[in-house]
Amino acid sequence: MIHSGAVMSMSILAFCLLACIHSGINAYPAKPASPRDGAPPEELAKYYSALRHYINLITRQRYGKRDTPDTVFSDVLMRESTESIPGSNYVRYDGLPLW
């Protein structure tokens, strides 16, 4: 009885992992197909436009929960609570340049 429960749990886990992997593959944009050799300029222009769009999609900035006003207030509270601890060497990296 216990063995069949373990097999069932493992099969459900495997199914969930496959579903997550499959959804992750479909969520990422596909790279445009490169034109054939000797392609006309119109086809090259269309390819470069699609390539530029693809690069813009995969390199765009993603805005998340840190941009909401609620987290700004909680960030201030978190900073004050960590600085009030004696001997705390908490360093914030917000001022460093992003590469």
From Swiss-Prot:
Any one GO CC term of the record? extracellular space
Q: Where in the cell is it found?
A: Secreted
The signal sequence is 1-27
- Transmembrane residues, as ranges? none
Positions where Tyrosine amide occurs in the chain? 63
One biological process term in Gene Ontology: feeding behavior
Q: Keywords for this entry?
A: Amidation, Cleavage on pair of basic residues, Hormone, Neuropeptide, Secreted, Signal
Pro-peptide region(s): 65-99
Named from the GO MF annotations, one term is:
neuropeptide hormone activity
Keyword Iron assigned: no
| Main location per the UniProt record | secreted
Which protein family is it in?
Belongs to the NPY family.
Q: What does this protein do?
A: Gastrointestinal hormone and neuropeptide.
This one is known as: Peptide YY-like
